Regions:
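N-terminal, positively charged/glycine-rich alpha-helical extensions of SAM-dependent methyltransferases
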Residues: 1-4
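S-adenosylmethionine/decaboxylated-SAM
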Residues: 7-85
């Protein structure tokens, strides 16, 4: 079993199996979504990964929702909007 902070994307921890990211990029490449809504930001690694995939297809933005006010994103990306609470 992997530890929670073992895997990172550009230095930001994410809690996913690495093969999940392959499926995410495939879906994003094929659909070029205008909007991705993510619930549960935690550290933001998956959020940042999704933003980078949207950069590659030149489309879309992400709204991420986190209930814990202590989990505000520690980075900025123009495609990401975070709501807390």
């Amino acid at each position: 079993m992997l530890k929670e902070k073992t895997l990172t994307w550009f230095g930001v921890p994410f809690i996913k199996f690495p093969h999940d990211l392959i499926f995410y990029q495939k879906i994003i490449f094929e659909t070029k979504p205008d909007l991705i809504i993510e619930t549960g930001t935690k550290h933001g690694g998956t959020t940042l990964f999704l933003a980078h995939m949207l950069d590659l297809v030149s489309n879309g933005r992400i709204i991420t929702i986190e209930l814990n006010p202590g989990r505000k994103l520690k980075f900025y990306h123009p495609r990401i909007t975070q709501f807390i609470g």
